[in-house]
Amino acid sequence: MNIFGVGLPEVTVILILALLIFGPKKLPELGKQLGKTLKSLKKASNEFQNEIDQVMNEQDKDESPISIESNQTNEINQEKIDSENSKK
C-alpha cells in the first residue's frame, strides 16, 4: 500500500499518533468529517474540470469554422498566385 508516497509503516505511525492525540472516542468523528471534506473537494474538483472541458469544447466549436474558412481563403490566394506566376 503506497498512497501519496506514504507506505504502510508511515500510515500505522500516523494512525497511532492520531489515536493518542484525539482519543478513541473522537477519532471516528474526525474520520467521518475528513471523509465528508474529501468528498466535497472531489465534487468541486469534478465540477471545475467539467466547466473547463465545456469551455474548451465551445472554443473548439467556435474556432473550427474560422479555421476552415481561413484554409479555403489561403488555398484560393495560393491558386491566384500560382495562376499569375504561370501566366508570366
From Swiss-Prot:
It is a single-pass membrane protein. PANTHER family: SEC-INDEPENDENT PROTEIN TRANSLOCASE PROTEIN TATA, CHLOROPLASTIC (PTHR33162:SF1). Belongs to the TatA/E family. The chain crosses the membrane at residues 3-23. The gene is tatA. One of its GO terms (molecular function) is protein transmembrane transporter activity. Gene3D superfamilies: 1.20.5.3310. Signal peptide: none annotated. Residues 67-76 have a biased composition (Polar residues). Residues 56-88 are annotated as: Disordered. Forms a complex with TatC. Keywords: Cell inner membrane, Cell membrane, Membrane, Protein transport, Translocation, Transmembrane, Transmembrane helix, Transport. Residues 77-88 have a biased composition (Basic and acidic residues). One of its GO terms (cellular component) is TAT protein transport complex. InterPro entries: TatA/B/E, TatA/E. Part of the twin-arginine translocation (Tat) system that transports large folded proteins containing a characteristic twin-arginine motif in their signal peptide across membranes. TatA could form the protein-conducting channel of the Tat system. This is Sec-independent protein translocase protein TatA. GO terms for biological process: protein transport by the Tat complex. It is found in: Cell inner membrane.
